[in-house]
Regions:
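A detector for small-residue-rich transmembrane helices and their helix-helix packing motifs
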Residues: 1-194
């Protein structure tokens, strides 16, 4: 049973629901469309956890990783949970929960460093930095075993993961760099844990 994968998906879903529907400052106006589909970054949790170069420099270093717990919009959370379930299950079936969690966190951390201090991103959210890290680990495991079918993940799910991987590179320059740096972090984590 993929303990890390399921637990992480549950955590990001709860944070998404709380931040989008419940813990919004009374001074903020959030439309029903923003709550249900488009998303917003006006909630208390988002303000406390999103990636911010300025706030990291002031000592709020948790933001290098905590931003991976946040999502803006229904499509964002659905696509990231789906990808996490697929690649997380595949990697966790080979490495176990602890190493998979460390690969995810390490990838998110490396991407956070890159995006905050090299790219100078002023605000960032999303688990995709860690997911792309797990995708890198998945690729390394596939190369090591000689096949992408090294895990119990069905072929259809691997196709969905491939679409997610390619599609995630086409949504914008900043997002592409988040994904590239997360993938690079995953390669480093893979060299450590595989």
């Amino acid at each position: 049973m993929p303990i890390f994968t399921i637990t992480f998906c549950a955590i990001i879903l709860v944070i998404y629901l709380l931040d989008n529907f419940i813990v919004i400052p009374k001074t903020e106006t959030v439309t029903l469309k923003e709550k249900l589909w488009a998303g917003h970054n006006k909630g208390y949790i988002n303000h406390a956890l999103h990636l911010s170069e300025k706030k990291i420099k002031k000592g709020q270093v948790w933001r290098l990783v905590s931003s991976s717990l946040l999502h803006i919009g229904t499509w964002h959370i659905i696509s990231n949970i789906t990808a996490t379930l697929i690649v997380g299950y595949a990697v966790e079936s080979q490495l176990g929960a602890v190493k998979t969690a460390l690969c995810f966190i390490g990838s998110a951390f490396i991407s956070g460093l890159w995006m905050a201090f090299v790219y100078k991103l002023h605000e960032g959210e999303g688990a995709s930095t860690g997911i792309y890290g797990l995708i890198a680990v998945f690729v390394m495991l596939a190369v090591k075993s000689g096949t992408v079918f090294f895990s119990p993940v069905p072929t259809a799910a691997l196709i969905v993961l491939a679409v997610y991987t390619v599609g995630g590179m086409l949504v914008g320059k900043a997002t592409a760099w988040e994904h590239i740096s997360g993938f690079a972090g995953g390669l480093l984590m893979g060299f450590i844990f595989i």
